[in-house]
Regions:
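Oxidoreductase cofactor-interface core, primarily capturing Rossmann-like NAD(P)-dependent enzymes
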Residues: 2-46, 60-63, 67-72, 80-96, ...
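A hydrophobic C-terminal alpha-helical subdomain
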Residues: 24, 206, 230-231, 242-303
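Short, conserved active-site loop motifs that form the nucleotide-linked donor/cofactor pocket
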Residues: 51-53, 150
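Cofactor-binding loops of NAD(P)H-dependent oxidoreductases
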Residues: 57
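Short secondary-structure boundary segments
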Residues: 79, 118, 239, 262-264
Length: 303
């Protein structure tokens, strides 16, 4: 099987992780084939303008995956899971099914290395308590069973989500379902992309490896203090008790109870030996994350 200049297929290319990986690889001069369900979207057009080959496909459609992986040297694999209110509803097999289809297509195409993004907690004591982790574990097993050389990344909470989609900040306060003294590891999407690029650049050193990714490990109270220090204003911490969400979402309440009781530790010093530029939350907020932070507080001030 001949490969086109070590082209890497990036799934989820218009999303948080896939978009960061595509941008990082393009910046490194790596040919990128970006998979999207809609090549007319603004993000897809931006990828094309940045130099990516944009292809239309669906992770649940094996034929489209065969076309997308043809001639690719590598694949970045990221899959949306099923959760309450999510796009796949209660299709609990979606993640493992699409991972299996992608792995099979990659194997058939002769892909030489696959980097799969999962989540922290898989394979640990939390897995038996959390359905989401069990589904992530099933997806990992599908990738391992594909026979394609691979690296698995297990990122923690995205720093970007604090100021964006998860709306943890509400009216200038940090509103959290976790207790004030509960530790929560965080990672920047750009650092996930950096680890993916490192694995693709030296697959021999990273094949078969699993990396749990975080650049910072802080309590909710510390997080509020860091945000307040960076933006120069008081950011109160407001806790939402588990009992307040139990009626509407029992699964979320169960997950929060487990997270409040079990710390998810990450070996950040070991990660920095691989990627010395790993960012803390404060470094991210004052650096590449500053536009997102500024935009959030500008909206607060304008309200």
């Amino acid at each position: 099987m001949s490969h086109t200049a070590k082209t890497i297929l990036v799934t989820g290319a218009t999303g948080r992780q896939g978009g960061a990986v595509a941008a990082r690889l393009l910046a490194d001069g790596v040919p990128v084939r970006a998979l999207t369900r809609d090549d007319s979207s603004a993000k897809a057009r931006a990828l094309a303008e940045a130099g990516a080959e944009v292809v239309v496909g669906d992770l649940d459609d094996r034929d489209s995956l065969d076309r997308a992986t043809a001639g690719a040297w590598g694949v970045f694999s990221v899959h949306a899971g099923a959760y309450e209110g999510g796009p796949y509803g209660h299709d609990l097999d979606h993640e493992s099914r699409t991972a299996a289809k992608l792995g099979a297509a990659a194997k058939a195409a002769g892909v030489e290395h696959l980097v799969h993004s999962s989540t922290i907690g898989v394979g640990g004591p939390l897995e038996e308590h959390m359905d989401m982790l069990q589904r992530k574990a099933e997806a990992e097993r599908a990738i391992r069973g594909s026979g394609v050389p691979h690296t698995i990344l297990r990122p923690t909470s995205f720093m970007e989500n604090t100021f964006d989609s998860f709306r943890e900040l509400q009216n200038g306060a940090l509103v959290s379902l976790l207790a004030a003294d509960t530790y929560e590891p965080h990672i920047a999407a750009d650092d996930i992309a950096a680890f993916a690029a490192i694995a693709f650049a030296d697959p021999g050193a990273h094949a078969g490896k699993v990396y749990e990714l975080a650049g910072d490990d802080i309590t909710q109270a510390e997080k509020a203090a860091i945000i307040g220090r960076v933006v120069g204003r008081e950011v109160p911490y407001v806790a939402i008790g588990v009992e307040q969400v139990a009626e509407d979402s029992p699964s979320t309440a169960k997950m929060l109870g487990v997270l409040n009781e079990h710390r998810m530790a990450v070996d950040i010093p070991a990660l920095k030996k691989i990627h010395p530029g790993l960012l803390t939350l404060e470094e991210w907020m004052t650096g590449i994350g500053k536009p997102l932070v500024d935009a959030y507080f500008a909206r607060i001030d304008a309200a």
